Regions:
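Solvent-exposed loop/turn segments at secondary-structure junctions
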Residues: 2-4, 43-46, 78-80, 136
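Intrinsic disorder/low-complexity segments
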Residues: 11, 22, 42-49, 85
Length: 200
């Protein structure tokens, strides 16, 4: 059973491919035996490649791979599958999502793919540009943002939430406990290490 983000990934792919190619693309639960297929998600990928593995991908790692009978777009977790779809649309078809209301979706009636074998795990676990338009859940997911300020629902694969968010220096490193032994961890004001009203 596909997760909400994997279902959303397939729907987004079909929507954008329809815009790009100018013809209908449908989401199907079973592969078409006479046409090339795009396999979205790790379970679908195993239909195309029986030894397909998500080992080492974590929640957000992606695989974009051509196979003899089509294309695999899958991730280590549901959010990873969504990111695989958006990365494919961006890197191989030229889509861009500039803001929640402005995007570039090119017209390509014919799409030819060379061999692709991409396996990528994001270097940064938490990605959150902090500006109003970035809080839009669709824009955030399409641009692979996953911070707690974004309006990301289950269909977007959720988000990372860290306790404290901001203004957390003293709760994390209480000066009563650490200042005497590690003054270098605290602000230097006019050449003096201080902890009174010196941190956010």
């Amino acid at each position: 059973d596909a997760q909400p983000a994997e279902k959303h990934a397939a729907t987004e792919l079909a929507t954008f491919l329809t815009q790009i190619a100018g013809g209908p693309f449908a989401v199907a639960a079973e592969p078409n035996q006479t046409l090339a297929n795009i396999y979205v998600g790790p379970q679908a990928a195993k239909i195309a490649q029986s030894d397909f593995s998500t080992d080492g991908l974590g929640d957000e790692g992606i695989v974009i791979r051509t196979v003899p009978n089509g294309l695999i777009l899958a991730g280590g977790g549901p959010r990873g599958t969504l990111y695989a779809v958006y990365t494919f649309l961006e890197d191989h078809l030229g889509c861009r999502w500039w803001s929640s209301s402005e995007s570039t979706i090119p017209s390509k009636p014919t799409v030819v793919l060379n061999d692709i074998d991409v396996r990528y795990v994001p270097v940064l676990e938490y990605r959150e540009p902090y500006w109003f338009d970035a809080f839009d859940g669709d824009w955030a997911a399409r641009n692979k943002c996953n911070g707690q300020g974004h309006r990301l629902r289950a269909e977007h694969g959720g988000k990372h939430i860290y306790e404290g968010f901001v203004h957390t220096f003293f709760p994390l490193i209480p000066p009563q406990k650490y200042f005497a032994d590690h003054p270098e961890w605290f602000s230097e004001i006019d050449g003096q290490r201080k902890h009174e009203r010196a941190q956010l």
